[in-house]
Design a protein with these regions (language model features):
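Generic alpha-helix initiation/capping and coil-helix boundary signal
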Residues: 7-9, 85
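Exposed, flexible binding/inhibitory loops of compact, secreted disulfide-stabilized domains
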Residues: 23-182
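Positively charged n-region of N-terminal signal peptides that target proteins for export
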Residues: 1-6
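Bacterial N-terminal signal peptides
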Residues: 10-20
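Enrichment for repetitive, rod-forming helical segments
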Residues: 9-10, 163
Length: 182
């Protein structure tokens, strides 16, 4: 009996340590296999696609001289968010940092990417809570962006969500972000 107890303890500890590593957080109601990915976007892509409310670095600001410029400029003219549907490898190569994606493991015949750009304070966790198509063919994806209260950055930044999803026909894509403070 004493040999079983240490073995059982090792098994339980192993499961507790390694089981969460293989899980992808997608939440419920996800019939299209929508998965959040941690792919890095090219700086040039982000600069070409600004979003409203973000504090961007002011290129004309020089701390050595008092030229009346501020270190940051808040975008007040761009859209509040931007959504991109990536269905081909060539598109992806122009958007993703090359060292963060293995194109040999992506089958663009069976899956595609959706990129959503928006302004936010730093989040530590994003979870897809729903991915479904409505009666009009609109692919609706909802995700939670969780931020620990008190850990926000002092200025809004341009944030992104990269979603890999099974190929499906749709008329439009609608993404909803629910911000949750914990």
């Amino acid at each position: 009996m004493k040999k079983i107890t240490p073995l059982f303890l090792v098994l339980v500890l192993s499961l507790a340590l390694f089981l969460p590593m293989g899980c992808k957080e997608t939440g419920g109601g996800n019939e299209y296999g929508a998965t959040l990915l941690n792919y890095r976007l090219k700086e040039s892509f982000l600069k070409e696609n600004p979003v409203y409310g973000v504090a961007y670095t002011n290129e004309r600001y020089d701390p050595a001289e008092d030229n009346g410029e501020f270190p940051y400029l808040y975008d007040e003219t761009s859209p509040a968010n931007r959504t991109f549907v990536i269905t081909e490898k060539e598109q992806a190569e122009n958007i993703f940092e090359d060292n963060f994606i293995d194109y040999d493991k992506i089958d663009f015949q069976k899956e595609f990417f959706i990129i959503y750009l928006y302004a936010s304070y730093n989040e530590y966790k994003k979870i897809i809570t729903d991915a479904a198509k409505d009666e009009n063919g609109v692919l609706k994806i909802t995700f939670e962006s969780v931020c620990s209260s008190g850990s926000e950055t002092p200025i809004p930044i341009q944030n992104s969500v990269v979603i890999k999803i099974n190929k499906t026909d749709f008329e439009a894509v609608e993404i909803t972000a629910k911000h949750v403070n914990k």
